[in-house]
């Protein structure tokens, strides 16, 4: 039975009804993660990558209080420049829906909406996590608890390097979230392939990840999994190089009194300037890379045959081969993606 608060793009609804692979995509990257026009261009490019790897893309957002699973082109264009759009996590989602507001969905909110829609795989850039200075602020992203409670696989390039990565991994372990390095023994750090920390698990094919998900469900453990997919080597910013720039940006945020949800957008904006635009180009590359793997995982989960590249071979930068081991402003209306 359709959920009364969800509106599906026709293509997404048809795919779900047919049991075809679908990949959820967040909308915060459009409203808060990238400048215009790269934000909208990237959203379209990521959707194209999902299609090329055999799945249907479903960008998630809240428009005038309705949860949209898949966005028509005119709404995507509008989101790219809209100003009255909230950044929604678990705590904000019911308010935005009840009040008829507009909102873009973070990792946590996208997971919730994807699960309600029957979508099991979600591609994003990087998750939130434990913020630096947490002993003073208690600033921990809701993404982490959502991974522990909502059964969706999140494919990302690790946690954002602006965070306290050791504590983020510790928190995920405590909450029982499997963290899988895809074809790597190292936990990636968004712009960099190696955070300096080991990946808790390693799997080398989408089919192996799908088997992990099925087994977790069979054991009735609840919650999702995190798939950490390193940025392609040609696109990365080495960890040592980005670390100094992050330290500068963090110091600037503290000096300016930036806190809460405003921290991540501020730091990303500062890093865009400090890297001369490289952080944005790397971000775009890693999101596409994650979208390819997410689509392959969705295909593997459905047991469907993709008409695109063989599973495991389509992700940019991936090395093919066998596994080595296991009253807001009015939004435009429209139907269709």
UniProtKB/Swiss-Prot annotation:
Catalytic activity as recorded in UniProt: D-ribose 5-phosphate + uracil = psi-UMP + H2O
InterPro entries: Indigdn_synthA-like, PsuG
UniProt binding sites for Mn(2+): 139
Tagged with keyword Zinc: no
Residues that bind substrate: 87, 107, 141-143
Note on cofactor: Binds 1 Mn(2+) ion per subunit.
Cofactor or coenzyme needed: Mn(2+)
Compositional bias (Low complexity): 306-325
One Pfam entry name: Indigoidine_A
Annotated segments matching region Disordered: 306-337
GO molecular function list: hydrolase activity, acting on glycosyl bonds; metal ion binding; pseudouridylate synthase activity
One Gene Ontology CC term in the entry: cytoplasm
GO annotation (BP), single: nucleobase catabolic process
EC number(s) from the headed UniProt entry: 4.2.1.70
Keywords: Glycosidase, Hydrolase, Lyase, Manganese, Metal-binding
Origin superkingdom: Bacteria
Active site residues per record: 26 (proton donor), 160 (nucleophile)
Subunit structure: Homotrimer.
Family to which the UniProt record says this protein belongs: Belongs to the pseudouridine-5'-phosphate glycosidase family.
PANTHER family: CARBOHYDRATE KINASE PFKB DOMAIN-CONTAINING PROTEIN, ZGC:136858
Its job: Catalyzes the reversible cleavage of pseudouridine 5'-phosphate (PsiMP) to ribose 5-phosphate and uracil. Functions biologically in the cleavage direction, as part of a pseudouridine degradation pathway.
Record-given protein name: Pseudouridine-5'-phosphate glycosidase
Name of the gene this protein is made from: psuG
């Amino acid at each position: 039975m359709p959920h009364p608060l969800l509106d599906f793009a026709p293509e997404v609804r048809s795919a779900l009804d047919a049991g075809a692979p679908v990949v959820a995509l967040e909308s915060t990257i459009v409203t808060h993660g990238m400048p215009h026009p790269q934000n909208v261009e990237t959203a379209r490019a990521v959707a194209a990558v999902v299609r090329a790897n055999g799945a249907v893309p479903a960008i998630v957002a809240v428009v005038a209080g309705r949860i949209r699973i898949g966005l028509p082109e005119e709404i995507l264009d509008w989101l790219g420049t809209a100003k009255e759009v909230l950044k929604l996590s678990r705590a904000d989602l019911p308010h935005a829906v009840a009040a008829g507001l507009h909102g873009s969905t973070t990792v946590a909110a996208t997971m919730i909406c994807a699960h309600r829609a029957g979508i099991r795989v979600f591609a994003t850039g990087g998750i939130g996590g434990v913020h630096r200075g947490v002993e003073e602020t208690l600033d921990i992203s809701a993404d982490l608890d959502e991974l522990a409670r909502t059964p969706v696989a999140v494919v990302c390039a690790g946690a954002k390097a602006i965070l306290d990565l050791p504590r983020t991994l510790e928190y995920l372990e405590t909450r029982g979230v499997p963290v899988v390095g895809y074809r790597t023994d190292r936990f990636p750090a968004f712009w960099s392939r190696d955070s300096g920390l080991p990946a808790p698990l390693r799997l080398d094919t989408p089919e192996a990840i799908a088997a992990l998900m099925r087994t977790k469900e069979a054991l009735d453990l609840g919650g999702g999994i995190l798939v950490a997919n390193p940025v392609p080597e040609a696109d990365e910013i080495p960890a040592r190089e980005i670390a100094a720039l992050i330290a500068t940006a963090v110091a600037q945020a503290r000096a300016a009194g930036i806190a809460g949800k405003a921290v991540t957008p501020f730091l990303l904006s500062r890093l865009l300037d400090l890297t001369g635009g490289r952080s944005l180009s790397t971000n775009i590359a890693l999101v596409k890379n994650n979208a390819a793997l997410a689509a392959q995982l969705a295909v593997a989960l459905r047991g469907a045959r993709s008409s695109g590249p063989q599973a495991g071979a389509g992700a940019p930068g991936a090395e093919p081969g066998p596994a080595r081991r296991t009253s807001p402003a009015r939004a435009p209306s429209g139907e269709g993606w």
